[in-house]
Amino acid sequence: MGNDRYNAVVVGAGPAGSTAALMMARNNLSVALIERGKYPGSKNMTGGTIASMPFQQILPEYWNIQGIPLERRIVSDELWLLDNDSAVRIGFTGKKFGMAPYNKHTILRYKFDRWYADQAVKAGAKLFTSCLAVDLVYHKTGPLSKKVDGVMLE
């Protein structure tokens, strides 16, 4: 990264960090997206879900995007309340859950995070991998002494 200057530095290229970088880059801000792994998602061993309604606001009709690493459509949700010797199950489904716009999708984070960070890069963000942010650098004197001037990297 050197002494490059950015309007924003986002630490972590998971879904939240990539969303922040993508939205700022779309709005013509210079953004550095810092990821400690060799690539976004390289440190993830689990999956997750993408809820359709909020994600469509970021990437409209995302389920039609070529190459997006979605796994399965989720057509029902269940919530289990457990006690030592009993359980209550509450389920919800809808006739339209299996039709576009789909309710939600499962993802494997090691695939999805890499793809999603690439969307931020295509929008103009700069991705730095194998890069660990260890501290903030503050403006040293004056009324702006609490203003962040930079990020210290390991």
Where are these regions (language model features)?
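N-terminal Rossmann-like FAD-binding beta1-loop-alpha1 element of flavoenzymes
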Residues: N3-L33
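Short, basic and Ser/Thr-rich N-terminal targeting/leader segments
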Residues: D4, R73-V75, T129
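Short glycine-/small-residue-rich flexible loop motifs, especially phosphate/cofactor-binding loops
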Residues: A21, S52, A117
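N-terminal FAD cofactor-binding segment of flavoenzymes
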Residues: N27, G37-D85
